[in-house]
Amino acid sequence: VPDSVEEQIELAFRRLGAVLVHEGLGFEDLVELVSYHVRIDEQLGAFREIKARCITREFPAWTILGVASLARPNLLVEIKAVAAAWVHGGRDADCIAR
């Protein structure tokens, strides 16, 4: 894990992007984002900047939480994300299309 908060944020978004791609999704499919920050005042600007590069829409909903610590002492930021995949066809297609 990198020491700088900027590098940790970049790494978190790269890993999130990789998970999304693996599932056939992208950042545009996110519906909820929760970020946890140690020393939130020191890192919020960098987080917003990096987030804006990855997520270019107004969505997803974003909750920002300041925390005393994370799972390991050197972790400064953590991201929880929820994405939604659109289902095309199948038995629910009529309900979705109406």
Name the predicted role of every residue range.
Residues V1-R98:
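Short, polar/acidic, helix-capping and beta-turn segments at strand->helix junctions
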